[in-house]
């Protein structure tokens, strides 16, 4: 049949060059990736057969074969799984249809250490290309189960590949690597060595559900010269499901390799969680909390969910129903005993057993994270840095587990510049007479600490939570209170700190209010298009003015967030607060009292408001006018 030549997609060509000219020390990972791909193909075929989606497929002896030819220096990884059609080969191998491709290439180029570079291969799902680390040429022969025609794909990794339809091909996929010469100095081992292949499979793929068989060499003994008699194919892996084995029989290394296989990650997990339920509904769960957040964790297309098995039969790779969205970073396996093998996503969404598993897994993960804070503070700090923002989403969406989520959370605060605090600890440190838990949201810790809204709290030593994640704007309103203490923004509504420390008497406040009443009314009138009200502030000690929102209104940051989501948000007028102890405000009040019709007073009021807006990170409504007024004032000082 006709052989056609095609060019690789640009990203695929760049990736190939990185693989071909690889300097990564651990080139053994190529076999892990190819065996993992073969295992996935077998899983898909068995599931299709169970659902009668592949009536003509042969599922009598599903397995993976490894075959070496020392003379030809080839290694073949073969499976009799689902296989691929001609179109699938073109789509899946000729191009890289992955939204993270550019990110992958960038990280691959920047990875300095060998382990980091090797592991990125699996992380981004392009393991097939890893074969070019050890081979000058790669040939793939495949036939989709139930079809009569096969496909041959060949490339030397030089920017092009050939495709050919073939009449004779066994069911499944065979990848033949034409190996480069061994080069021990560059960690390029002899991958025709049976001993080396056994070592790699045992290390990376021992838990694979399907038998991985090493075939004897053609015409040889298949044992690297250990005997003259031909032998049967040797099964290299134990095929034991780790979650079904007693805990004391499974090593940390075995758990870590399973995690890497499931998550396509190269780093060890942060925490391993095992769970077993017996009785009327039995299941086993083996979950992993990663040590780092994937680059696409907050994108809409992020593939969340854990693997679902039924009686050790693989059902699906990303069962979203087993964990809520705010735990989408958790990876692992759930093996249920009493579900139907023909289960569908629609059934899963309504199945009470699945809901029961989700509740149990959620509570277990949350309690594990909470315990990490005291048992392993360093690991907890890593968890919170990587996944804290995701977990806090549950404070909005998961009211049933809100208390457990809060118990697992920690927040930056003014109490300690390095260590975040739990709400429980904040409450224990509250000043006598303090009734509220104070917080402020902002883009960064530095921006919040420099905000005028923080001045009185700093002066009186009142602790404030410093919240810098986008979700913080939402969850504080959803939660509302903790242990009877109201969560109160220092930038919204009126703040009364008089109970925490000696302050002005009511008589003094009343006198001051009368002294400034005229100025406040006049400024409210002249700034009416910009502000709802001008009033004296109890939160300022250094700055002349600040702008605040009413207690029930959206913050500017939250308004911007909703607008970015395409929602219309009516702009709310803010409140301008003046510091009656600041010299500028005192001078403005005297000037207004002496002569209320001076044009400069209106300009000063505008400038004061604009400066307050700038101080909180906003921008004046008319930047050009603000610049003009400032320039005029500066000119008068010279």
UniProtKB/Swiss-Prot annotation:
Keywords: ATP-binding, Chaperone, Cytoplasm, Nucleotide-binding, Stress response. SUPFAM superfamilies: ATPase domain of HSP90 chaperone/DNA topoisomerase II/histidine kinase (SSF55874), HSP90 C-terminal domain (SSF110942), Ribosomal protein S5 domain 2-like (SSF54211). GO terms for cellular component: cytosol. SMART domains: HATPase_c. InterPro entries: HATPase_C_sf, Heat_shock_protein_90_CS, HSP90_C, Hsp90_fam, Hsp90_N, Ribosomal_Su5_D2-typ_SF. Molecular chaperone. Has ATPase activity. Belongs to the heat shock protein 90 family. Residues 346-560 are annotated as: B. Residues 561-638 are annotated as: C. CDD domains: HATPase_Hsp90-like. This is Chaperone protein HtpG. Residues 1-345 are annotated as: A. It comes from Streptomyces coelicolor (strain ATCC BAA-471 / A3(2) / M145). NCBIfam families: PRK05218.1 (NF003555). It comes from the Bacteria. One of its GO terms (biological process) is response to heat. One of its GO terms (molecular function) is ATP-dependent protein folding chaperone. Homodimer. Pfam families: HATPase_c_3, HSP90. The keyword Repeat does not apply. It is found in: Cytoplasm.
